[in-house]
């Protein structure tokens, strides 16, 4: 009998986002404004590397005049028709996995971006049969919906990780790729286990996380790594692989106090 293994890999891509950093000065010098825009700022820093176009400006909520309250207007770099560096890595990885006879799940998290439709278009243009599982499919029907698509020959399933975090067996898909992550540790852990069920017969399931180095995506993943490291120690699981290996958590008590 083959022994089963579950592997987690992180893949980083480099990209410059210098044009967003000027907001840091505002956040450091005006606490009142910072409290109002911090969430929008962090979301922008996380999403911009994946989609460097089409973002609304961040405005000072205490200045009513629209022509004077723009704190940062993210510069458009390209358009939806351009292939982004992460797209290239994703498509190469999917191509390799399909050649090995596997099916692939691509998880996306940023609901305000056009990621799912764009990736579906890219895959379709390459002749890959892909499907998008969205929230329009009722929760109780999602597993049946996926099974039907598999029988129809779908090789790549694109969905939001939050839609499959509980209750689904997705054993037909043995490669899981997080194109981006919502940085919710519970959702990540649940979604990453959808293909690693008790009735899984494949010898291995591989999980990949794509991120741009030296960006908010990178920092958030390191934070999640520390949380995952702490969680697995509490549960009695010690791991030096995958996401947990990104953690610089040395002292468990200190890390829990700082980041949980």
Where are the regions a protein language model picked out?
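Conserved Helicase C-terminal RecA-like lobe
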Residues: 1-8, 27-157, 162-168, 238-260
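Short, glycine/charged-enriched secondary-structure capping and boundary segments
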Residues: 119-123, 146, 171-175, 191-193, ...
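Short, acidic/turn-prone active-site loops that include or flank metal/cofactor-
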Residues: 135-138, 180-185
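A short beta-strand element within the Helicase C-terminal
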Residues: 168-181, 205-209
